[in-house]
């Protein structure tokens, strides 16, 4: 679809800052490093614009595809309402849409957007909605119905679920290690540790020289 590249860009610029804001909040709460409010506010403004544009494009696609429904719209129709009594992905679609709409409304309200207790909730809703829309709402319905008109519902297997969770876990582990190292360098903790080790070594060397003398 011609709007697909724009939707990918807008949702990426909405989901990415959501994850960054959540990381900033965790850093501010659990480390000595302080993230300025202006940086978080700028990211929240970017999310508001990009999420609103993504929702507008989604609604436009729904109207265009379903206004004069053809066989090409069966995938979207199945995603929204189901086909032939098969509705496995319908809850995923509507939950994604509700998450993004609720998050967008929260971001539109300045009192919520600048409230750092409510802002993480909006970020989680937006990120979850976009993740569902890009996974269960985009990849899977592309194969439903099949080119010959068959409708076969898809259910993630246990192995697929474990692999997905494992990939996310490895990603968060790498991010945690990198953030700990970067924060340690920026705050001077690693430098102080090296200096302390150097001083200990010099003292040990001096004591050994005195003993030899």
Which sequence ranges carry the predicted segments?
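Long, contiguous internal "core" modules enriched in hydrophobic/ aromatic residues
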Residues: 1-113, 129, 189-192, 203
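Extramembrane terminal tails and long inter-domain/linker segments of multi-pass membrane proteins
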Residues: 78, 143-156, 164-213
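Hydrophobic transmembrane alpha-helical segments of multi-pass transport and channel proteins
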Residues: 128-135, 161, 165-169
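Central hydrophobic cores of alpha-helical transmembrane segments
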Residues: 118-128
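Catalytic-face loop-and-helix region of soluble metabolic enzyme cores
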Residues: 108-120, 169
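Membrane-proximal extracellular juxtamembrane segment immediately upstream
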Residues: 131-146
């Amino acid at each position: 679809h011609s709007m697909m590249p724009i939707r990918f860009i807008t949702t990426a610029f909405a989901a990415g800052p959501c994850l960054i804001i959540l990381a900033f909040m965790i850093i501010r709460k659990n480390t000595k490093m302080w993230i300025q409010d202006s940086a978080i506010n700028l990211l929240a403004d970017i999310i508001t614009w990009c999420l609103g544009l993504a929702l507008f494009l989604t609604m436009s696609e729904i109207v265009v595809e379903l206004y004069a429904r053809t066989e090409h719209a069966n995938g979207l129709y199945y995603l929204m309402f189901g086909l032939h009594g098969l509705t496995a992905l319908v809850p995923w679609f509507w939950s994604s849409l509700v998450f993004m709409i609720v998050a967008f409304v929260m971001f539109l309200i300045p009192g919520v957007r600048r409230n750092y207790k409510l802002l993480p909730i909006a970020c989680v809703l937006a990120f979850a909605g976009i993740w569902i829309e890009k996974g269960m709402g985009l990849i899977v319905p592309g194969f439903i119905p099949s080119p010959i008109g068959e409708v076969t519902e898809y259910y993630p297997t246990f192995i697929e679920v474990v692999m997905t969770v494992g990939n996310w876990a490895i990603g968060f582990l790498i991010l945690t290690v990198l953030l700990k190292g970067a924060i340690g360098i920026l705050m001077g903790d690693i430098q102080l540790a090296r200096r302390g080790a150097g001083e200990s070594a010099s003292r040990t060397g001096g004591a050994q020289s005195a003993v030899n003398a």
